[in-house]
Amino acid sequence: MKRHRIVAAAVLTLGAAAASAGDDAQLRAADPAELSYTYAVGAFAPEYTPPAPGSYTLPPIDTVTDHALLGADGRPTTLFALTQGRLAVVAFVYTTCIEATGCPLSLAVLHRLDRAIAADAELARRVVLVTISFDPERDTPARMAVMRSFHAPASDWRFATTRDEAELQPLLADFDQPVAKLRFADGAWSGLFRHVLKVFLLDGESRVRNVYSVGLLDATLVLTDLRTLLLASRRSPG
């Protein structure tokens, strides 16, 4: 297995109120809209050079269905309404995540992708980034709007959440995205989640074409995959 060097840091300053993971009440009260976010935007630097776009194929892995969402503007929407038949990079996060190689890393890589996509006319027209919260209890549309404002997207980068767990769970199951609340011995929720970092690449037919975990989540690789799918679509326009 090839090693990767972490050259990106993602630091979420929670402040004294959330410094102790043992204080459930304080963790629950932590509000990202009032906290100081500091992201050193970067990515993993893999010890290999990705192959040239179009020199390989990305066979479909799975297909996802449409799901109800709430946009950062508070309006009801759906996954497919956001993607609109375009290539999509979809990531699941929660705004109070403090694991550097978790949600902050995902957001940092999507931030780099956003800038690169905006600088390429074809990518800007045919690619959408979608960040969805798996913490509907705290990550309201207003909170997702704060996150969007922080990143100030240059391309079409959408931020969304769900109304409740009833809408969230089928969405997570469809993507095979494991998420579980971390609880104290007495069963009380710590305010944190155990989750596996996954970022999904969807084609225009909502088929999963790649899944990036910590060891593969590199903006250069994702961009190469996007260009590979665009080249393939030109060869097979139907």
Give residue spans per PLM region.
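Extracytoplasmic
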Residues: 62-64, 82-89, 124-127, 139, ...
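Short active-site neighborhood of thiol/selenol oxidoreductases, capturing the structured segment around
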Residues: 78-109, 129
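Sec/Tat-exported extracytoplasmic proteins
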Residues: 62, 86, 93-96, 101, ...
